[in-house]
């Protein structure tokens, strides 16, 4: 079976083509193409602008993916698309494209939960069997484990997502959004040397990131580190009246990462203890962060476990993860009728019946 997957829940538009061989061989990635809407430094991406980007690029990416995969329309069994969660206008743009292809080509639709797509692609690439999943992105922060044909959420953010926290601080510092604000925060954090005290908010299995964002934004304003015209290469401590070094932009990025990642490690470890798992799978765009992987690895090794993560091809939003999860659902008989192919911005991970797993 072959599926085309369309992803566009945020600023990244992805088209992927996945093959599940009939002979039982492992699935094959035939094409995985992505195009990102990049907004100016200091700005986020508005839904209407992002949707316009997706509409302009989706047909080009589908054509390119088919060419790269060396498959024809006749070879495709189904069209998979992100049903949610995500931003309304971008989601709707991609859903309309999926409906158009379904009607033009006479192929069936499969609506896919974005979070489940991340999990299934992570499981496929890393070979992890039944891990505790840390799903961290710009719109979601969840600690997940599988049970009774559901991906159960054991903990999550109480307010904003961890990726949103990083992205919004990047706006405060006017850090470039190319290739991604979180990635540029990570690179700047590597130069940080001073750990600044920031709010640490873990409530049971849940985290809160709005308070730490407000605190670090306030420090950036207090020390005059926000706004345009800052040179990262000359980001050096400025002595205060007592001769102590005031934090630099790099110090604030470093401190923000260390604090929020410590919160994520704590809640993930608690979930591992609860379900008796020795594996952690990190998925979502923030999962590319090497420091997060390092900190999670230290915790897992102390417990005699292991950490699994993918590179940016599969961690960051992509179409191939939608094709993978869609094919798994399609193989169990799941279809999305045209009348039900609307989008759900708050489509919960645990709303999905995972029929393809025991």
From Swiss-Prot:
It catalyses: L-threonylcarbamoyladenylate + adenosine(37) in tRNA = N(6)-L-threonylcarbamoyladenosine(37) in tRNA + AMP + H(+). Gene3D superfamilies: 3.30.420.40. GO terms for biological process: positive regulation of transcription by RNA polymerase II; telomere maintenance via recombination; tRNA threonylcarbamoyladenosine modification. One of its GO terms (cellular component) is EKC/KEOPS complex. It is an enzyme of class 2 (transferase). Its cofactor is a divalent metal cation. The keyword Cell inner membrane does not apply. A divalent metal cation binds at residues 114, 118, 135, 317. Binds 1 divalent metal cation per subunit. Coiled coil: none annotated. One of its GO terms (molecular function) is chromatin DNA binding. Pfam families: TsaD (PF00814). Its EC number is 2.3.1.234. Keywords: Activator, Acyltransferase, Cytoplasm, Metal-binding, Nucleus, Transcription, Transcription regulation, Transferase, tRNA processing. HAMAP family: Kae1. NCBIfam families: gcp_kae1 (TIGR00329). Component of the EKC/KEOPS complex that is required for the formation of a threonylcarbamoyl group on adenosine at position 37 (t(6)A37) in tRNAs that read codons beginning with adenine. The complex is probably involved in the transfer of the threonylcarbamoyl moiety of threonylcarbamoyl-AMP (TC-AMP) to the N6 group of A37. Kae1 likely plays a direct catalytic role in this reaction, but requires other protein(s) of the complex to fulfill this activity. The EKC/KEOPS complex also promotes both telomere uncapping and telomere elongation. Component of the EKC/KEOPS complex composed of at least bud32, cgi121, gon7, kae1 and pcc1; the whole complex dimerizes. PANTHER family: TRNA N6-ADENOSINE THREONYLCARBAMOYLTRANSFERASE (PTHR11735:SF14). This is tRNA N6-adenosine threonylcarbamoyltransferase. It comes from Aspergillus oryzae (strain ATCC 42149 / RIB 40).
